[in-house]
């Protein structure tokens, strides 16, 4: 397949991705083992965040990391692609964190998502969906900012293909980059949501109330 050799010529990236997958799998197993069936929410959160991080590494690796590392291009274009990808991802994560923090800062949401059951505080999985719904109702500035991030990342990558004398074999990587960049941003944001909702918040509630926060079925 045209361009498939570019995926195979750089074994270091595959080794890094495989190493991350192995490390996150070990981390997930350790979290489940440490929980020992008690259903502690923050340990479930650790496992979920590790899974999101592993998927993000694979998606980002298959998309823009392979593109900027394997395709021969001028150093200025390579630097521009890296800068846009890294800056855009960080901006996306910061924006997501602000949206989620705004929802978690509402006492009515905390009271609804985390129910005091006497000896423990119970959290329902439906709260994640409620959080996503509420956090997605962000202001127009945040929506425009996230839209510009996605547009800028794809525009720079496509502009490099137009202006730089890239080989035709790079088109497969270009296609995968354009296709998977939104997915990488989604999983980066999902990891941020998991950290704030399923790790930071339950740990804070456990310190305040002196009770474990557990995960329950809907």
Q: What are the residue ranges of the model-derived segments?
A:
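Loop-to-transmembrane boundary segments
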Residues: 1, 44-52, 123-155
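Hydrophobic membrane-targeting alpha-helices
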Residues: 29, 61-65, 161, 187, ...
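Juxtamembrane/interface segments at transmembrane-helix termini
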Residues: 34-38, 90-112, 186-214
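N-terminal first transmembrane alpha-helix
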Residues: 1-85, 169-180
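Cytosolic/matrix-facing juxtamembrane and C-terminal tails of multi-pass cellular membrane proteins
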Residues: 117-139, 190-218
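Transmembrane alpha-helical segments of integral membrane proteins
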Residues: 156-167
């Amino acid at each position: 397949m045209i361009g498939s050799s570019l995926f195979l010529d750089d074994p270091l990236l595959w080794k890094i991705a495989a190493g991350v997958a192995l490390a996150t799998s070990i981390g997930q197993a350790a979290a489940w083992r440490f929980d020992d069936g008690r259903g502690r929410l923050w340990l479930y959160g650790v496992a979920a965040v590790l899974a999101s991080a592993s998927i993000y590494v694979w998606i980002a690796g298959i998309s823009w990391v392979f593109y900027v590392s394997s395709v021969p291009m001028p150093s200025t274009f390579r630097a521009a692609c890296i800068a846009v990808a890294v800056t855009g991802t960080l901006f996306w994560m910061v924006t997501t964190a602000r949206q989620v923090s705004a929802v978690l800062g509402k006492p009515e949401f905390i009271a609804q998502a985390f129910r005091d059951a006497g000896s423990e505080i119970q959290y329902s999985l439906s709260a994640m969906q409620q959080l996503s719904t509420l956090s997605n109702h962000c202001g127009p500035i945040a929506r425009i900012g996230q839209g510009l991030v996605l547009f800028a990342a794809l525009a720079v990558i496509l502009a490099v293909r137009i202006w730089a004398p890239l080989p035709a074999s790079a088109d497969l990587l270009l296609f995968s980059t354009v296709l998977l960049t939104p997915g990488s941003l989604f999983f980066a944001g999902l990891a941020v949501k998991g950290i704030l909702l399923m790790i930071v918040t339950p740990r804070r509630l456990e310190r305040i109330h002196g009770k474990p926060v557990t995960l329950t079925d809907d």
